[in-house]
Amino acid sequence: MRLVAPLLLILTVAPAAADPATAVYNHACAWCHGRDGRGDGPAAFSINKYLSPRPRDLTHGRFKLRSTPSGELPTDEDLLRTLERGIPGYMPSFRGLTAGERQLAVTAVKRFYPAFASAHPMPVSLPQPPTLDAATVARGHQTYEAAGCASCHGERGHGDGPSAPQLKDETGLRIRPADLRYPARFKNGAQAIDVYRTLVTGLDGTPMPSYADVFEDPGTLWDLVAYVGSLAR
């Protein structure tokens, strides 16, 4: 009987076990994104301390890699795609987790931004790619110049445009434009449909805007996709 009180005390003060979503997040994500999702995990400050991208602050609700319009929250599928693919050069793929564990990680990520609870994000329309040929590349080159893409990405897509040295992300960190010769490094995917999605949605929090309202004709965007693809080494 004398053991009952100490046992009750132990049960009272012992910390509750993390729920499954938090447990997966703490195991797989907190090292970079931090236990509280602020992008300040133990490894965060060894990752490009003075350059963007840094680990995402998940409490701000601003996500780069989405299929939703600029300024909108991502869908669950967007978050899962990022977990499955990773971000070349910055974030590993988490295909080593089970599908269920990745879904739990998404649940944990969404908890850091309360607006997810009532949000119903809808993806933009992504039409099927047309045939991309020399004619579309030529038109895309004209669009590339007319839209001012070279100011950041450079005349030949090397990421060395005149604006490149001054570019910063929303936190004030310097950010480099993509070198379009190396699609394997594209953060939002290297396939034609991925590039189209990036042009339509933009990369929120960076100088890369959405062109959805600039080019209302999907054909013009596909021309630009074709030209970007032609720059690959």
Where do the model's predicted regions map?
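Sec-dependent signal peptide recognition
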Residues: 1-7
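Electrostatic cytochrome c docking/interface patches
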Residues: 10-25, 116-145, 184
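Periplasmic/extracellular electron-transfer cofactor-ligation site
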Residues: 23-52, 115-119, 141-172, 201-210, ...
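Catalytic cores of nucleotide-enabled group-transfer and carboxylate-activating enzymes in metabolic
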Residues: 35, 105, 109, 128-134, ...
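Extracytoplasmic electron-transfer domains, predominantly the class I c-type cytochrome c fold
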Residues: 47-95, 102-110, 166-229
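Short, structured interface segments
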Residues: 104-122
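Short, charged low-complexity intrinsically disordered segments located at boundaries
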Residues: 110-114, 131-141, 210-211, 226-231
